[in-house]
Amino acid sequence: MRCEMLRPLLLSALPLLAASTVSGQAPTPPAAQLEAMKRFDLWVGEWKGSGWLSRGGDGRHEFRIDEKVQRKLGGTVLLVEGRGTSRTDKGQEVATHESVTLLYYDDKAGRYHWNAHDLRGGTIDAEPKLVDGGFEWGFRVEERGVTVRFTIRFDEKRWHEVGETSADGKTWNKFLEMTLERQR
C-alpha cells in the first residue's frame, strides 16, 4: 500500500531529476560561501611538522603531525585530515591523534562551522572566529570547568597552532603547540 501511495510522488519527481541531469550544467556553488572560504586559500595543502602536548603533571609529550587540507564541494567546504604520532619508551611509533574536520561557511546564519571527529569517537561542533592570519575555535568542558581554545595561524609556508585552557576566560594556559611546514 505504501508503494502505491509513493508512486505518484516518485513519478512526478522523475522528470525534474532527469532534466537536471540532461541539461549538462553543473550546479553553481553559492557566491557568499565561496567568498567566505577564500579566507582559507593559503591553508589548503599538505603539511608536516611537530609539536608538544602537556597533560597536567604528566609532563610534555612530543609528537609528529601530518595534516591535509582539501577543498570539497566546489570550494564551499574544507576537509581537514590530521594524524599525529609519537614514540613509546621502546621506540615504537603509535598514533596519538587522528581526526577529520569539516570547515564551512553558513551564509544564511552568517557564520563559520567547525565540525570535528576524532579517533576516540569525540565530536566537536564549534564556531570559528577569524583572527589576524588565521582563526580561533574552541569549546567548553563543563565537567572540568574550563574553556579550551585553539588558535591557528598560517601563511603560504607555515602553520602554527596553539591550544590553551582557561577557567575564567581571561587567564589562558598553553597545553599544546605545533608548527608545520607546507609540503605541497
Protein language model features and the residues they cover:
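N-terminal secretory signal peptides that target proteins for export/translocation
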Residues: 1-6
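Bacterial N-terminal signal peptides
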Residues: 8-19
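Hydrophobic small-molecule pocket/channel-lining residues, especially in calycin-type beta-barrels
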Residues: 24-184
